[in-house]
Amino acid sequence: MGVGKHQGFTFFIEGCTLGDKVLFEIVSLKKSFGIGRTIDILEKSPYRVDSKCEYSDQCDGCELHNLKYDKQLELKKNIVKNNLKRIGKIEDILVKDTIGMEYPYRYRNKGEFKVGKGYQIGYFKRGTHEIYPVEKSIIQKETVDVVIRLLKEFMMKYKVDGYDRKNKRGIIKNLVVRTTRDNRVMVVIVTSTDKLHHK
């Protein structure tokens, strides 16, 4: 997501990144900011890269992955500085550089996923309550991908429905997976019923 200003008014714009010049449409306006969606990238940022995540255009987990990694770290530092200044009213404070990693993938040890009708397991699509199915995530540990696959296989085999948020029907609502450095895994399945009934 990019941030731009027009006559001092701030817009948060989906589909662009730091340094892009874009044509965008206004999706919504609030009192102090607006939300926009990129229609066309007029000039690509010199910091733009192709995201390695196949879901990055739909989910928020990898929204910075179309930005060079050193710029991601710089941007995160600036976000902290700006929040301290704007929210905390702290002007004169040293914010050290964000510590990066050699391989910025497969590092996250906790994944939270929505489960929906049709055995969908994934994230909400950006700005909606519609589930975007995910089979693998480049920021989660590989073990998380295995758990997602096993839960889906279980649901299909035993005809256990995912939760339909619109009709408030179905059983499995959420999946939470935590992993440790020594490869232990904790799996939490959130249901709408006290017992997991299956045939």
Regions found by a protein language model. Name each.
Residues M1-K199:
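Accessory RNA-recognition modules of RNA-modification enzymes
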